[in-house]
Every structure is written in structure tokens, then in C-alpha cells.
């Protein structure tokens, strides 16, 4: 996240830290942002706060991003993490008597995700480019929150534990990552090179046990 924030050209950066441990927030500011908070808004709700606080921290960050977008700015929004936002809504939903429908998550969780995520995007004056992190157990991409997020967003970048163990950083699994808009935002040559690279990586993956 810090690399993206420092390297982006967005005028305004909005960072939502939902469900993080309290000590991780100053560490993130110091080590990842190098204490540089210029044109940056940070919204936090730590793991020891109530589910309502964690839930509305995400919506507050999105509202702040929308405010600057409607003022004509290009905004970068980063939210860590959607999983903890969903867990907060799960606590709220189950406490009000909602039945769990998928791995303990009630229907309200899956109704809220598009209400949050689909607010990002362009307006007549500005734009919001949003990155939402999703945590999955054991790199299981069939996790219901990951699955629902993929169906809403324009693309996903998959980071895997096995690439981390091999020393790759950032550990991006190119074969599992995807973009619905890549052919619209890069040159034709770039896109063709990407397809060639993906075919090569696919062959390596198929034959890695040999």
C-alpha cells in the first residue's frame, strides 16, 4: 500500500484502515508513508472498536473520497481491509437475528459490498481510483468475500504466500490476477506483450513438476 501511495500521481490520497491493530497504524505512517501525510487523509477504526465503528469507517472514507472527487480532484482510495469490514457487518447482522448463508456471513454483508465499492469511479469533474484489500485463508480465492468482490470490481491482483516464500516481492500471481479494462488503458503492443508473457508463465506452471 505504501508503495502505491508514494508512487501515485493522484492529487488526494484517502486511506481507510479498518480493523487493524492499534499499534500498526503509527507503524504504517512511519515506515510505509515515511511520515509524509501531504494531501493524505487517513480514516481508522481499530480492531478493538465496535462493529459499527469499523463498518462506518469504510463508508466515511468513501464519502471523503467522493467529496474531493466532486471538487474536481483525482483521488486514490485504499481500503485495508474489506474482509474486516465484512466481519464487522457479520457481527451486526448475526446480532440482529439474520441467518448465516455463506461461511457464517449473513445476506446483509453481500448487499453492502456493492453499496460501498460501486461508489468509486469517475464523475464529470474528478475520479476515484480505489484499491480494496481482501484477506483469504490459505490463498482460497473461493472465499465468499473475495468472490463477491471480484464480481463487482474491474480487476483483481492476487498476492500468494508461495511466491513470498520464494522471495518474490510483491508476490503477484500474474496467472490468477485479471483486469477487465487492460485492453482499454494500455497500448496494443503492451497488451500483446502481456498475453505472450501470460502464455509463457502458463507453460512454466504446467511443467513445473517435471
Task: Name the predicted role of every residue range.
Residues 1-210:
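P-loop NTPase catalytic core
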Amino acid at each position: 500500500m505504501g508503495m502505491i501511495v508514494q508512487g501515485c500521481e493522484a492529487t488526494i490520497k484517502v486511506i481507510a484502515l479498518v480493523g487493524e491493530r492499534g499499534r500498526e497504524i503509527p507503524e504504517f505512517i512511519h515506515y510505509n508513508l515515511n511520515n509524509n501525510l501531504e494531501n493524505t487523509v487517513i480514516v481508522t477504526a481499530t480492531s478493538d472498536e465496535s462493529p459499527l465503528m469499523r463498518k462506518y469507517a469504510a463508508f466515511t472514507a468513501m464519502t471523503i473520497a467522493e467529496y474531493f472527487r466532486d471538487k474536481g480532484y483525482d483521488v486514490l482510495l485504499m481500503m485495508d481491509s474489506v474482509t474486516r469490514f465484512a466481519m464487522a457487518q457479520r457481527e451486526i447482522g448475526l446480532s440482529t437475528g439474520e441467518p448465516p448463508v455463506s461461511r457464517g456471513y449473513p445476506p446483509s454483508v453481500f448487499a453492502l459490498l456493492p453499496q460501498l465499492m460501486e461508489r468509486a469511479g469517475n464523475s464529470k469533474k474528478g475520479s476515484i481510483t480505489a484499491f480494496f484489500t481482501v484477506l483469504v485463508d490459505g490463498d482460497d480465492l473461493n472465499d465468499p468475500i473475495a468472490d463477491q468482490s471480484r464480481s463487482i470490481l474491474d480487476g483483481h491482483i492476487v498476492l500468494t504466500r508461495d511466491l513470498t516464500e520464494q522471495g518474490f516481492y510483491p508476490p503477484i500471481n500474474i496467472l490468477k490476477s485479471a483486469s477487465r479494462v487492460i485492453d482499454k488503458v494500455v497500448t496494443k503492443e503492451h497488451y500483446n506483450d502481456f498475453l505472450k508473457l501470460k502464455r509463457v508463465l502458463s507453460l512454466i506452471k504446467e511443467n513445473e513438476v517435471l
